[in-house]
Design a protein with these regions (language model features):
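Conserved H-loop
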Residues: 81-83
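Alpha-helix N-cap and loop-to-helix initiation/capping positions
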Residues: 54-59, 96-99
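C-terminal regions of RecA-like/P-loop NTPase motor modules
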Residues: 20-38, 65-75, 86-170
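Conserved inter-motif catalytic segment of the P-loop NTP-binding fold
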Residues: 1-55, 62, 89-90
Length: 170
């Protein structure tokens, strides 16, 4: 398995403070030289424009728009990981919502799909022991498709999530 991963066409660039222009240039180069199947930006709030801006919210909005244009230009899906604001902390129901996307309402507008991760057992004072070891993928936006919640198993010691085991005896 490790041999397959070593030979896989995966390119990781963990350069700090990448600008949108640098990301666009690298995406074009990789597509031309190796082919490109997916772009992942981890995470959006670490991006910088390299210039003075009026507000961070405007800057993040511009990144959101530029990433959408980049995905269309290079014709591949683009996943942009984003932090949430502290909205859930002030609510009784701690489940994240679209409005909790940090620093920009345009993230919600530009995205074709928004998935939020929620771990009920990670909340202080969690009483939902029946859900221990589970998490939810909340499909909060899906342009042209259904929205809803998908329960999954958390396997945090392996830094992964998996399908829940199904009961074939019911």
């Amino acid at each position: 398995t490790m041999g397959k991963l070593e030979k896989a066409p995966i390119f990781i660039d963990d350069s700090p403070n990448l600008t949108m222009m640098e990301i666009r240039t690298k995406a074009r180069q990789i597509k031309q030289k190796h082919g490109l199947g997916l772009i992942v930006v981890d995470y959006l709030q670490l991006m910088t424009s390299g210039r003075k801006v009026e507000s961070r919210q405007q800057e993040v909005s511009e990144f959101s728009r530029q990433l959408k244009l980049l995905a269309k230009e290079v014709e591949v899906p683009l996943i942009a990981i984003s932090q949430l604001n502290r909205g859930p902390e002030s609510r009784t129901d701690k489940k994240p919502q679209l409005a909790d996307l940090r620093e920009s309402g345009s993230l919600e507008q530009d995205a074709d799909m928004v998935m939020l991760l929620y771990r009920p057992d990670s909340q202080p004072g969690a009483l939902d022991n029946a859900r221990e070891g589970e998490a939810d993928i909340i499909l909060a936006k899906h342009r042209g498709g259904p929205v809803g919640t998908i329960p999954i198993a958390e396997q945090l010691k392996y830094s992964r999530f998996a399908n829940l085991a199904t009961d074939n005896f019911s």
